[in-house]
Amino acid sequence: MAIDEDKQKAISLAIKQIDKVFGKGALVRLGDKQVEKIDAISTGSLGLDLALGIGGVPKGRIIEIYGPESSGKTTLSLHIIAECQKNGGVCAFIDAEHALDVYYAKRLGVDTENLLVSQPSTGEEALEILETITRSGGIDLVVVDSVAALTPKAEIDGDMGDQHVGLQARLMSHALRKITGVLHKMNTTLIFINQIRMKIGMTGYGSPETTTGGNALKFYASVRIDIRRIAALKQNEQHIGNRAKAKVVKNKVAPPFREAEFDIMFGEGISKEGEIIDYGVKLDIVDKSGAWLSYQDKKLGQGRENAKALLKEDKALADEITLKIKESIGSNEEIMPLPDEPLEEME
């Protein structure tokens, strides 16, 4: 239905006035603005990139990665930093926990020489640094590790037994209100690593778990990823890593509630080769006959770990199988579930 001509003129005049005050593009007709594809940063995990629906975490948005201790939260975040740096991105790591392992980060592919790192003393200091570097327009990705460690100054300056109810939640709410628009304008991705706590006095229905820092982050985050350790990986009775499951519990840029499973190897991080084998077998791209795995006429190895070792050495072959997996799944298809049973014994 056509809009009245007088209304059109009034709206056009209002848009011109708004452009003068707030800059061009402050108010636009959606039909006049070309809808752009959402850019993404790979997570370093083939399965999680597919589960997120756009090939990774969206740029210019807030992401929350949470889970129990030693579930792979920081490992996943460091992989995202490494992928961002591979494409020329500038990254920062706000280490509120003062626990960044630089050697491990380097093993995961992070360019530690060019990684900006801050170890703030208080939550206010951390969030001020975050706002300043974001407003600079020169940063592509910021990781905050973790929300639980963003301790308000009043709590640090107070005595050990003092009660400071809701201080951290108010601090987070205030910071997120200020920074959300800036992140979008500067196309900067912000990742908050968060921990799980048990709700006090929880009875009846609903999950007894909650995340720290209040409710603001739950609302402002465009993507929330719940990552859990689900099994131990063993080879010759030696514990060599963990199997992790990541669930996209909130997604504003694609359908939510998709899941991905992957191996996190000690000292190496996410095993891309393990995912290639899992998805390859599921899609009949990689053949499994007994313990032997093969691709076309080439034997990959006897057992999953041997096949992973071969793919790690032969990058061209790994890339070829990865491409076939992506073509088979298709960019608009639902994520293919992983095998119901692992290819090798886990506990």
UniProtKB/Swiss-Prot annotation:
InterPro entries: AAA+_ATPase (IPR003593), DNA_recomb/repair_RecA (IPR013765), DNA_recomb/repair_RecA_CS (IPR020584), P-loop_NTPase (IPR027417), RecA-like_C (IPR049261), RecA-like_N (IPR049428), RecA_ATP-bd (IPR020588), RecA_C_sf (IPR023400)
Subcellular localization(s) per the UniProt record: Cytoplasm
Pfam families assigned to the protein according to its UniProt record, in alphabetical order: RecA (PF00154), RecA_C (PF21096)
GO molecular function terms noted in the UniProt entry: ATP binding; ATP hydrolysis activity; ATP-dependent DNA damage sensor activity; damaged DNA binding; single-stranded DNA binding
Domain of life: Bacteria
Keywords: ATP-binding, Cytoplasm, DNA damage, DNA recombination, DNA repair, DNA-binding, Nucleotide-binding, SOS response
A cellular-component GO term for this protein: cytosol
PROSITE patterns: RECA_1, RECA_2, RECA_3
GO biological process: DNA recombination; DNA repair; SOS response
Major location category of this protein: cytoplasm
Binding site for ATP: G67, P68, E69, S70, S71, G72, K73, T74
Role noted for this protein: Can catalyze the hydrolysis of ATP in the presence of single-stranded DNA, the ATP-dependent uptake of single-stranded DNA by duplex DNA, and the ATP-dependent hybridization of homologous single-stranded DNAs. It interacts with LexA causing its activation and leading to its autocatalytic cleavage.
Family: Belongs to the RecA family.
HAMAP family per the UniProt record, alphabetical: RecA
This protein's name: Protein RecA
